[in-house]
Amino acid sequence: MPTPMTPVKVGALACQRNSFLFDGFKTLVVSCEPTKNKKGEIEGYEIELQDTILFPEGGGQPSDSGFLKIVEGNRNSSKIEKILVSHVSRFGLHAKHHVNDYIEPGTTVEVAVDEQKRMDYMQQHTGQHLLSAILERNYKVDTVSWSMGGIITKKKPVLEPSDYFNYIELNRKLTLDEITNVSDEINQLIINFPQEIIVEERIGEETVDEVSTSKIPDDYDLSKGVLRTIHIGDIDSNPCCGTHLKCTSQIGSILILSNQSAVRGSNSRLYFMCGKRVSLYAKSVNKILLDSKNLLSCSETQISEKITRQTKQIQQLNKREQYWIKRLARTASEELMNTLKASGKKRAYFMEEEYGTLELLLQIHKEVSNFLKDDTEGYEIILCGYERQTNTGSLLILSESGEKIANLAANLGSILQNLKGGGGKKGGKWQGKITSISNAEFAALSDYLSHDFASC
């Protein structure tokens, strides 16, 4: 047994000995070390406890999150404080709890785990063991790796319903019949023939000939640690450090998708989810179906047909729009060139006040460029588009002179507060975007183009 200030090794943690211990667990703080960012500033602390019911990330299972309640130590013991543990990481045989507050080593804390998250993770993880075991036993299909879905990250703080699916990578693609049969058998083992799940622990150099240790992490010293083997009835025996259910009935249900993704040659990813996720997924998908029915004014079975029909209509409308954009651009460019020639001032502008998209302005620029390519004399052209529905706009300034472009951009910038753009330092094209425009600014812009700019 470890001494009071000697931490229990990963493999024999309280969360691994009893995965249903969710709160009320008291232990000691062994160490509390600061973590620093790239600037050397303290951004948090890593705490190692004498023992813990918070599982450190490993075995394809994310870490738990939870709280530490200070019950005595360097703070007022009469006031219990809750400190959030955002995640727990493993360093060799040690579990490190990531927190924002310093806790004095020797302090007694009470640990609580996020029970809902733990149960969800166990349902997915135990479900994966059972799924892989059935595939290997019945079809000789090997699980190469697996990944748990439904994990919120900084890169993806909001998850789509499909993000909650886990996947196992297999050494070949399954047929639809195989997926159906596997689903039926697993649901039988959940509902009608539940299997007891037992965790066997071996310490140090005990013989483990019947269990492969090839997937034990390289940084886990098995000679000093604990080898945990998860037995699901007589169906499966596999080494695993994760937390698991006590019986297959606790998996609740399993949903396996028929669509698979090809990866690494002939390998395939099979997507599945277990337990409460299945009902939550059904609710979210049902809402999407109801919303789609209402928006499309059709029944569920007609949604696909309706979307296909509308997609074709949109494609046809896009083709028509492109045709008329080119026609309008050609006409506008001819008018611009006529204005340049007639005025003798080499200044002209175009303004569209309703559907003045950047696409239209760029097409006009393309047409105008064909006229200007052989013109060596000076010119200044402003193309302005306003989209009334979004209250945004676009601007192009064309000139052979970078100085002229800069002057015009400055003038327009003094009128339009939210105009930003660039380019044309050596002549050519300056392109800008107006993120929003007031009525007063729009009136001032119109006045500038028709009077100040055109009459100079």
Swiss-Prot record:
Its cofactor is Zn(2+). Zn(2+) binds at residues 125, 129, 240, 244. GO terms for biological process: aminoacyl-tRNA metabolism involved in translational fidelity; regulation of translational fidelity; translation; tRNA aminoacylation. Binds 1 zinc ion per subunit. It comes from the Eukaryota. SUPFAM superfamilies: ThrRS/AlaRS common domain, Translation proteins. GO terms for cellular component: cytoplasm. GO terms for molecular function: aminoacyl-tRNA ligase activity; ATP binding; L-seryl-tRNA(Thr) hydrolase activity; metal ion binding; Ser-tRNA(Ala) deacylase activity. Keywords: Metal-binding, Protein biosynthesis, Zinc. Present with 1470 molecules/cell in log phase SD medium. Belongs to the class-II aminoacyl-tRNA synthetase family. Alax-L subfamily. May function in trans to edit the amino acid moiety from incorrectly charged tRNA(Ala). This is Putative alanyl-tRNA editing protein alaX.
